[in-house]
Amino acid sequence: MAKAKFERTKPHVNIGTIGHVDHGKTSLTAAITIVLAKTGGAQATAYDQIDAAPEEKERGITISTAHVEYETKNRHYAHVDCPGHADYVKNMITGAAQMDGAILVVSAADGPMPQTREHILLAKQVGVPAMVVFLNKIDMVDDPDLLELVEMEVRELLSKYGFPGDEIPIIKGSALQALEGKPEGEKAINELMDAVDSYIPQPVRATDKPFLMPIEDVFSISGRGTVVTGRVESGIIKVGEEIEIVGLKDTQKTTCTGVEMFRKLLDEGQAGDNVGILLRGTKREEVERGQVLAKPGSIKPHDKFEAEVYVLSKEEGGRHTPFTNDYRPQFYFRTTDVTGTIKLPADKQMVMPGDNATFTVELIKPIAMQEGLKFSIREGGRTVGAGVVTKINN
């Protein structure tokens, strides 16, 4: 067969399987590839290939993640599956595997379990926009009333954590039957993929979002003015456009008078480009690493926020001891460290290495931020945690 595999003409979406241990996430992932392989939309991948997920490092944290790709009639998908619960927690908090949507796998025989709850909560906290449910192992349940009961429980749980529990598609099936090639098993997988296609919204492309570029370096070029360099995170910047410099100090307005890439002058820079941007009338000492250039009014500086954080274990090179209220580490946002103070919730005395927790942070200087922004927590230059901003408080 010719290697005319994935044409990139279809819109791309990142998804992942989440849910309690042993409810069938990896079997489902394998089943999707095997069923879609029949129509040429995937390379059939066996359970043990996915289960032996390689370790990856993301911001100093070791995470095991399996990646598979496949396509339906309408879309191309990159799908992540993690072998262990801790891998999910780390993955979702660090954003190592960006999820535009999730497939929540629940065993019909067991119903929602502790990690089912935790993954739904995490998905809400880190801003996974939508999810579809696969009620797995229905071949192990003889009683239709029990299936109905489990479905109701799942819907209530989703609503409790702020997802539209009444609207979310719940597909009932058996990943095992699909792996065995049974027609009813395959039918459920096809139904699931139709639901994923129609219910999980197409993500907004980075170039369609407002312009934002974290500043990495600042130079002054004699006779031309100040140039800041960095990688454009989102949007497009055109020569002549007004921009704001946000974070660390009061927000300033300036104008982009030139965009340079690989020493060539361009009319514009866009998401993903490493560029130098020439700023009109801005002095070298008025800009610094850690600020961002942004479309006016699109992002504001803040110093108080709530976060969901994973604290590295001792084995991962993290702290050996727990931390308590008023702990003051550095928070590394985009390109710079800012000191901040942690306030734990009233019912939590301490946070242990290897745990994840929700707490409030107050920084000594404001940073350009929006919900969903990722950061690292550092102590003396080493990473001790990773987090995501879940709510801005001022």
Curated annotation (Swiss-Prot):
CDD domains: EF_Tu, EFTU_II, EFTU_III. One of its GO terms (molecular function) is guanosine tetraphosphate binding. InterPro entries: EF-Tu_GTP-bd, EF-Tu_GTPase, EFTu-like_2, EFTU_2, G_TR_CS, P-loop_NTPase, Small_GTP-bd, T_Tr_GTP-bd_dom. The keyword GTP-binding applies. Gene3D superfamilies: P-loop containing nucleotide triphosphate hydrolases, Translation factors. GTP hydrolase that promotes the GTP-dependent binding of aminoacyl-tRNA to the A-site of ribosomes during protein biosynthesis. Residues 19-26 are annotated as: G1. Its main location: cytoplasm. Residues 10-204 form the tr-type G domain. Keywords: Cytoplasm, Elongation factor, GTP-binding, Hydrolase, Magnesium, Metal-binding, Nucleotide-binding, Protein biosynthesis. It comes from the Bacteria. The keyword Protein transport does not apply. Residues 174-176 are annotated as: G5. Residues 136-139 are annotated as: G4. It catalyses: GTP + H2O = GDP + phosphate + H(+). Monomer. It holds the Pfam family GTP_EFTU. Its EC number is 3.6.5.3. Residues 81-84 are annotated as: G3. It comes from Rickettsia rickettsii (strain Sheila Smith). PROSITE patterns: G_TR_1, G_TR_2. Residues 60-64 are annotated as: G2. Belongs to the TRAFAC class translation factor GTPase superfamily. Classic translation factor GTPase family. EF-Tu/EF-1A subfamily. This is Elongation factor Tu.
